[in-house]
Curated annotation (Swiss-Prot):
The gene is hisG. Pathway: Amino-acid biosynthesis; L-histidine biosynthesis; L-histidine from 5-phospho-alpha-D-ribose 1-diphosphate: step 1/9. Its main location: cytoplasm. It comes from Saccharopolyspora erythraea (strain ATCC 11635 / DSM 40517 / JCM 4748 / NBRC 13426 / NCIMB 8594 / NRRL 2338). Belongs to the ATP phosphoribosyltransferase family. Long subfamily. It comes from the Bacteria. Feedback inhibited by histidine. Keywords: Amino-acid biosynthesis, ATP-binding, Cytoplasm, Glycosyltransferase, Histidine biosynthesis, Magnesium, Metal-binding, Nucleotide-binding, Transferase. Catalyzes the condensation of ATP and 5-phosphoribose 1-diphosphate to form N'-(5'-phosphoribosyl)-ATP (PR-ATP). Has a crucial role in the pathway because the rate of histidine biosynthesis seems to be controlled primarily by regulation of HisG enzymatic activity. One of its GO terms (cellular component) is cytoplasm. Coiled coil: none annotated. This is ATP phosphoribosyltransferase.
């Protein structure tokens, strides 16, 4: 039986469970449930702290896990990233008091840096050849400067609102660009079962990025239509009762779909329909 770790709380928990459900896997109904058995798919899910998931997977106790890329890297566990899931995006960056003027990574030499990700910070500082005092805190690192514990911080930055609230400004290149990812232990067993789960999730990710367009097109404009909606290789075309028209079906980028529909209508396409895709295999 495949054993899979899922975040039990935080911003990754809800989307991760929803994506697994879309992929056809049973998920928990009560927040207090720590495990869920899915006998149909021969999978057992374990709901764990996101920060611990890479450790469990890396130790070989679990086969796969969903966690943040930043958490997996900071754990130092022997895990590999199998699939980026497209949610929970953030950047991990240095930040310092705005009143101190412009900072660079070099200015951190000899300074105290508070962070919940000491391994990531230590590795990044080494890349720049900078020696600093890295102070590990479990959360709310923004307040550490005000309390005199640190001179700068390194933390996950989303909208930047929290930094602004504490009069901090981010500087330097992102230490890590993170999102939710599927991880596995290097050299672990059950490869076929793991590949199947990853393929299902990949189908959901892909479906979220595309829509299906159906429309009727004048036969003499098919070449132009095919350029607009090439699909994933070639659009599907079917004859209609009126020989001057052809039905066309193609997958297009969800973001680009409205503009493509406008252009199709402009050159004479009719009955243009956009529909969501639940899942797919490519």
């Amino acid at each position: 039986m495949l054993r899979v770790a899922v975040p039990n709380k935080g911003t990754l928990a809800g989307p991760a469970s929803e994506m697994l459900a879309e992929a056809g896997y049973r998920q928990r109904h009560e927040q207090r449930d720590l495990t869920v058995l899915d006998p149909v798919n021969d999978v057992e899910f374990f709901f764990l702290r996101p920060k611990d998931i890479a450790i469990y997977v890396g130790s070989g106790e679990l086969d796969l896990g969903i966690t943040g890329r930043d958490l997996a890297l900071d754990s130092g566990s022997p895990v590999d990233e199998r699939l980026a899931l497209g949610f929970g995006g953030s950047n991990f960056r240095y930040a310092a008091p705005a009143e101190a003027g412009e900072w660079s990574v070099g200015d951190l030499a000899g300074r105290r840096i508070a962070t919940s990700y000491p391994r990531l910070v230590t590795d990044d500082l080494a890349r720049y050849g900078v020696s600093a005092d890295v102070i590990r805190l479990d959360g709310a690192v923004e307040i550490s400067i005000q309390l005199g514990v640190a001179d700068a911080i390194a933390d996950v930055v989303g909208s930047g609102r929290t930094l602004r609230q504490h009069s901090l400004v981010a500087f330097g290149e992102p230490i890590c660009s993170s999102e939710a990812v599927v991880i596995e232990r290097r050299g672990s067993d059950q490869q076929e079962a793991k590949d199947r789960l990853v393929a299902r999730l990949q189908g959901v990710v892909f479906a979220q990025q595309y829509v299906m367009l159906d429309y009727n097109c004048p036969r003499d404009l098919l070449d132009e239509a095919a350029k607009l909606t090439p699909g994933l290789g070639s659009p599907t075309m079917s004859p209609l009762a009126d020989e001057k028209w052809v039905a066309v079906r193609a997958m297009v980028s969800r973001k680009e779909a409205p503009a493509i529909m406008d252009r199709l209508a402009d050159f004479g396409a009719k009955a243009i329909l956009s529909s969501d895709i639940r899942s797919c295999r490519m």
